[in-house]
Amino acid sequence: MAVVLPFESPNPASLNRLVELVAPDMERVNATILARTGSEVAMIPEVANHLITSGGKRLRPMLTLAMARLAGYSGDGHIKLAAAVEFMHTATLLHDDVVDESGMRRGKVAARMLWGNEASVLVGDFLLGQAFKMMVEVANLHALEILSSAAAVIAEGEVMQLGTAKNTATNEDEYLSVIRAKTAELFAAACEVGPALAAKEKAELAACRSFGMNLGIAFQLIDDALDYGGKSAKLGKNVGDDFREGKITLPVVLSFRRGTESERKFWNRTLGDADIRDGDLDQALSLMAKHHAIEDTVGRARHYGAIATDALALVPPSDIKSALEEAVAFCIGRAH
C-alpha cells in the first residue's frame, strides 16, 4: 500500500536561485572540501569521497554562504566554515549509518557496507577533526563557539535518539527534542556563523539562528514523512527503513497515540519488540493513512517552515532573502 503525501501540486519551488547566487563561493567550498579530504592514508579519501560525491544538495554550506552574504560579510572565513559545516554533516551520516545499520545512503551502497563499520566511524572522526581545524584557522572565537557547541548538541541528539528507539511511549515533545538536537542544530549553526563573522548584533544573530532551527525541524519532519510515503529511487534509501530500524518518528507517534488498543499492540510488537513480519509495513502505512499521520506531519512541517520565513521578516528585501525563502518552500514541498 502506498501513502500519498498531501502536496496540492508538484513542488514549484527549487534551490536554483540559491545555487546560482552562491555559485562562485560554492566552487571555492567544493575545492576546499576536496583538498581537506586528502590524506596519505588511502582509505580516508576513498570512504569520505564515496559519500561526499554522491549527490547531496550541499544545502547546509549553501545556507552558511547565503547568510554571510545577507549579513554583508566581505571576508573569506565563510568558505572554510561552510566546508566545516559540510564535513560535520558528512561525519554524522557516516556515524548514523553504523548506528542504524543502514545499507543505502543517497542512492548508493552505504560506506559501512563497503569498508566496514570501523572505517566509517574513523573516517567520520577524521572529517570532524578537519572541520575543527578549519574553524580554528578562521580565528573567530564566536564562530568556533557556535559550531563546537553544535557538535556537542548533535552528539547529544544521537544519544537521545537511542533512548527513543523502539520506545512506542515516546511523545511528540520528546520526538521534537531529538530532531532539534540531531538535525536542526546544525542548520541553526550553519545560518548563524556567517552573521557572527560579520559581527552582527544579537537580535540579527538570533533571527538567523531561528531561521535555521525552524527550517531544520521542517526538513526532518518532511524526511520522516517521506520515509513512509516517498519513492526509494528519489529518497536515496529504501522506503520504510525507519520502520525496519525501529525508529520512533512523528508518523508513528501520531498513529500510536490515535490508535485503538489492538493497533497499539501492533506498534508494540513491530517497533517495540522488533518482531516485523511480512505485510507489517503495509499495515503500518494503512494505520498512518487511517489516522492522517503523514498529512499531519507535513502540516507541522509547514508550520515550522512559516516560522523560519517569519524569522527573516525584518530583513530588507533582496535576491538572497528571496532565495532563502524559496529554499524553505522547496524543503517543505519536496515531492519525492
Give the location of each predicted region.
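All-alpha prenyltransferase/terpene-synthase fold signal
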Residues: M1-H336
